[in-house]
Amino acid sequence: MLNAKDYMIYRLTGEIVTDYSDASGTNLLDITQKKWSDELLECFGIERNLLPELYPSSKIVGIITEEAARETGLTAGTPVVAGGGDGSCACVGAGVAAEGKTYCVLGSSSWISAAAAKPFFDEARRTFNWVHLDPELYTPCGTMQAAGLSYKWIRDVMCGEERKEAKFMGIDTYELLGHLAALSPPGAGGLLYLPYLLGERSPRWNSDARGCFVGLGMSTEKKDR
């Protein structure tokens, strides 16, 4: 049972491994002990020998084999490190490599996270924890499903006229929509958008949640949404 990057490592090196950060997203890792949870494996009926060995993200876990070198053009013997999960790599990419630093990602989805010396176990289960690329740190996280995806949905479903206009002007539709949104006063005239197009995760996990606009009125203009 391998994550995507771990399968790539296997093809390059022949080693069946993963790192703590990616493993922490499987819900099978005891993140405080940095080992697979015997209790959870037993609960789900998963044999331990089906799971990869665990290493820190920066650990060299193998070298590129002769076969992989022939198939990829890479140099045989090149060291390969365990790497990290996407969220934990984004954390380091944002410069969050010390306790107390925070960051926000706005992509297709979005999340807010921080580097912490210990995991934050929320009794209401609104958030979750990754292991940081630095195995001495954690990244408690709250995440939403449709951030940039909401913007794309609005462009595709509600902005046919703007798409044509942007094409005529030779600019990206998002650039035109940005100019339009800048004309709306702060607060968008009281219009509120709930971005639950794909259900929602934090703070109340609900796959059946659906999005809506709240506060529509006769004074609402296209620039507001």
Question: Which sequence ranges carry the predicted segments?
Answer:
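Active-site core segments that coordinate phosphate-bearing ligands/cofactors
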Residues: L2-T18, N27-D38, E42-G45, I60, ...
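Short beta-strands and strand-loop turn motifs
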Residues: D19-D22, R48
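A generic secondary-structure micro-motif detector
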Residues: T26-N27, L54
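A conserved helix-loop-beta module that forms one wall/lid of the active-site cleft
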Residues: G45-P56
